[in-house]
A protein has these predicted regions:
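Central I-helix of cytochrome P450 enzymes
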Residues: 4-53, 156, 171
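Short, hydrophobic/aliphatic alpha-helical segments
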Residues: 5-23, 124-143
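Acyl activation and transfer enzymes in specialized metabolism, enriched
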Residues: 25-30, 93, 149, 162-166
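A structural signal for well-ordered alpha-helical segments within the folded catalytic domains
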Residues: 32, 60-63, 133, 137, ...
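Conserved cytochrome P450 K-helix E-x-x-R motif and the immediately C-terminal K′/meander segment
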Residues: 53-93
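Conserved cytochrome P450 K-helix/beta-meander segment immediately N-terminal to the heme-binding cysteine loop
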Residues: 104-131, 139, 144, 151
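Cytochrome P450 heme-binding "Cys pocket" and the immediately downstream C-terminal segment
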Residues: 149-197
Length: 213
């Protein structure tokens, strides 16, 4: 950005905001998704213990768990855009030039018409309609898609994908590694939500490692 600051017409204030955003997008979002994935998978295994071997050995299944976590918990619950020109949506709604459009990503990702009657629940075995991303719109789409999507969540596998040469993402590898060394909730020190925000963040998530005595 510094090399092209003049060409792009970026002010110093715009540069500062972009740098701050990169720190948020590149670290905070991944750390938050990491804890949420651990929580969802631990909860899933409590009711589906038969999947424990898959968590340990099948990286593609773990990646599916990551995608399901991200679907339920987009880093930002909304997306906001300003219309640069008049546009008519497929539904027939007209959006005038200059209008601010707010997309409720969390509700879109939990639409039962798209994701089934249990759309609000964690289910890594969820069947998906053709053309629907397993993580919904959590990474946005089109020209605004998150540039860190493949790095964090990996490439969406297709039938016949081999885990040996598949980019499964940083979250998949780190979550599987922690689960394989026996991460579990601390029974005497339960996790707590962050009371300083309305968003569903964990404020504390104490864990233990190794098998229970």
């Amino acid at each position: 950005m510094l090399e092209n600051q003049d060409e792009l017409g970026l002010t110093d204030d715009a540069l500062r905001r972009e740098v701050a955003f990169f720190l948020l997008a590149g670290a905070h979002t991944t750390a938050t998704a990491f804890v949420r994935a651990i929580d969802h998978i631990i909860g899933w295994l409590e009711t589906h213990p038969e999947d424990a071997d898959l968590i340990a050995s099948d990286r593609l299944f773990v990646q599916r768990c990551i995608h399901e976590t991200l679907r339920l918990n987009p880093s930002s619950p909304i997306g906001r855009r300003r219309a640069l020109a008049p546009v008519r949506l497929r539904s027939g709604i007209d959006i005038p030039e200059g209008a601010v459009v707010v997309i409720d990503l969390q509700q879109v990702n939990r639409d039962p018409v798209v994701f089934g009657d249990d759309a609000g629940e964690f289910n890594p075995r969820r069947p998906l309609p053709p053309g629907v991303a397993p993580f919904g719109l959590s990474f946005a789409a089109g020209m605004h898609v998150c540039i860190g999507q493949d790095l964090a969540a990996g490439v969406v596998p297709t039938p016949g994908t081999s885990p040996d040469d598949h980019l499964s993402g940083l979250l998949t590898g780190s979550v599987q590694q922690v689960l394989n060394i026996g991460v579990r909730r601390d029974p005497v020190n339960p996790p707590e939500r962050d009371k300083n925000t309305a968003r569903p963040y964990w404020g504390r998530y104490p864990v233990l490692f190794g098998k229970e005595a």
